[in-house]
């Protein structure tokens, strides 16, 4: 599975290998690929995380979901966390802006000594409109990255047919659970 990442810590361009994890809301990345990120971070791979929306729909606004997310992603080993403020439950209306934002992040905000080799993002068999929109934006914006993997979340349809499975040790699952505990909302 990790032939793209395991061969060496340097990419073909003599840059550090990197991962880009993209989620629609605070907690999506942690739920969907948290254990994998913890494993890859321990291997020394650079990890950047992008949370596309505020995630505040259905909350009273007192809890800062971005702060929860920053703390959780730090536990997973993310080196860089970027929170965008697209409207929660309205991501499908902002598709072009999300594509532009992701392209800008890839081009201008990832350190110049890092080459993104893999993307973890939402997938197209998800019933949440924000998840589906983030999947669509990710597929366009990340089209030049060698590997794009979709991760499962609780709103996944039964039609989701995973083709890649990552085996993770219990220690990484424990790290994932610790990260999820940072989400009080």
UniProtKB/Swiss-Prot annotation:
GO molecular function annotations of the record: hydrolase activity, acting on carbon-nitrogen (but not peptide) bonds, in linear amides
Highest taxon in the source lineage: Bacteria
EC number: 3.-.-.-
InterPro entries: GlcNAc_PI_deacetylase-related (IPR003737), LmbE-like_dom_sf (IPR024078)
EC top class, as a word: hydrolase
Keyword presence, Glycoprotein: no
SUPFAM superfamilies associated with the record: LmbE-like
Pfam families membership: PIG-L (PF02585)
Keywords noted in UniProt: Hydrolase
Classification via PANTHER family: N-ACETYL-ALPHA-D-GLUCOSAMINYL L-MALATE DEACETYLASE 1 (PTHR12993:SF30), N-ACETYLGLUCOSAMINYL-PHOSPHATIDYLINOSITOL DE-N-ACETYLASE-RELATED (PTHR12993)
Similarity remark: Belongs to the PIGL family.
Record protein name field: Uncharacterized deacetylase YaiS
Originating species: Escherichia coli (strain K12)
